[in-house]
Amino acid sequence: MNTMENKIIKSKKAQVSLEFSFLFLAILLASIITISHFLSQNFTKDDKVISDVENAAKTAVILANSGYNGINPNVTLIYGGISWSGNKKNIYIYISPKSYITPEIKNFIVSYIYNVTKINQSEYNITVNP
């Protein structure tokens, strides 16, 4: 009788564990769906483009500082940030010190951003230090 009770208790524990796992899975799935819905409703394609441009601009400044593609800024360039117009089609990249940003460096940064992000150049205008 004692072994029979142990088997019943063990099976009940397993049943509770299985039910808890299904409950946890259902809560996790509902959370993922809610977050996904929230993000898709609150962030547009333009928001993603701005995020991609910002990441590419940071990388371009790092590459320019390292002498990539023969660029020699003579000082350490500092990525200062990004801003954009109301319609999010004009994107401005700020790099300092401004006096050391040559047209060659500007062209490299802008072309690097367009090449990496694959955004439409006729739709989005990127300017360095406007």
Curated annotation (Swiss-Prot):
Extract the InterPro entries matched here: Class3_signal_pept_motif (IPR007166)
Q: Residue ranges for motif QXSXEXXXL?
A: 15-23
Please describe the post-translational modifications of this protein. Answer: The N-terminus is cleaved by the prepilin peptidase EppA, which recognizes the class III signal sequence.
Q: Please tell me the species this chain comes from.
A: Methanocaldococcus jannaschii (strain ATCC 43067 / DSM 2661 / JAL-1 / JCM 10045 / NBRC 100440) (Methanococcus jannaschii)
Q: What is known of its domains?
A: Contains an amino terminal motif QXSXEXXXL, which is part of a class III signal sequence.
Tell me, in one coarse class, where this protein mainly resides: secreted
Annotated GO CC locations? cell surface; extracellular region; membrane
- Which protein, by its recorded name, is this? Probable pilin MJ0835.1
Q: Which Pfam families match?
A: Class_IIIsignal (PF04021)
User: What positions belong to the pro-peptide in this record?
Assistant: 1-14
Localization: Secreted; Cell surface; Fimbrium
Which UniProt keywords are listed? Fimbrium, Secreted
